[in-house]
Amino acid sequence: MGRVVAIDFGEKRIGLAASDVMKSIAFPFKTVEASFQLEKTLETVAAALKEKEPIDLIVVGLPLMLSGHDSPISIKAKAFGEALALKMQTPVVFWDERLTSKQVENNLREQKLNRKERAKASDVLAAQLILESYLNKL
């Protein structure tokens, strides 16, 4: 029985979260630095995710516009997710993550974290929220 992992895709950093093997709880896992080279970013993410194998499913967050249409970053997230599915030979689903980053930012501000601390934690916590949202729909 494998895990479900989630990805909060960004051009600078990528947040990763993983479920327990029962697929009921989402845990923040790791933040990795993105590269301008897709293949290098894929290698970095795939290497990080190998720590959580076996993986049954990868959930990639899509930061859609409020209208529901693709944003420039959601188009890149789709391309990344499709390439990662091929690389890891693991199914990928895309999950609407509108306002996830804003929710995380508000939560971190309430904790009185400075900007540097918020930036460090926001991507991995956004991945956790994406995964929680997905797991709650199962």
Indicate residue ranges for each PLM-predicted region:
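Conserved catalytic-loop position in the HRD/HxD motif
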Residues: 8
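Phosphate- and other anionic-substrate recognition elements at nucleic-acid/protein interfaces
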Residues: 2-4, 12-138
